[in-house]
Amino acid sequence: MTEAALPTLKEADALRADIYRLLASLLRQTPDAELLEWLAELTIDQDGSRLAECWQALSEAAAGTEERSAKIERLQSAHFRHLVGVIQGDVVPYASWYRNGELMEAALVALRQDLRALGFVRSEHTRDPEDHLAALYEVMAMLIDAESQEQAYFFNQHLAPWAASCCADLGQVDTAFYAALGQLGSAFMESEQARMSVNAGHVPVRIVER
């Protein structure tokens, strides 16, 4: 009998980077029809973990029985209500808000210093401050892609203190898709916290397309 080959460290890290990018995309904007279909058709290895359960919930929320264009229109409205808002959404996905109680505060100042030190420059195409959760997830994806030794430092300094709480708050909203997204984000942050704490080769739940 032979055991199935486990993912290599590089494969596991590539998956981590992809998850960060996916979460960032879904936090920034409504998924299009192609992404919704991809999520709906995911097959998850059911290993009993919270991550696997959360992936399954997101996939089921992306599927549903609703006509695709109507679903996207509904999700656009939900995204605005939950994450943007006229003044602010149900969830305010900024580090300063969670760590300092106000926007544009000390957490953003410290983040900007570290981003400069790491060589990152703010995109001219975004109006969001750099401490938006999606932006931090994008930075983590790039650090992983670059096999940077600064991953743990950046995560512990700028994500660990608040990201799981922010995602947990999103997990309480009344739209199934965004609640599932928040729960997945929270579970993934817990997984990443464990990885960073022990600096071990923890492998996130494997996702297989049908």
Residue ranges of each PLM-predicted region?
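Surface/interface-facing alpha-helical segments and adjacent flexible terminal/loop regions used
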Residues: 1-210
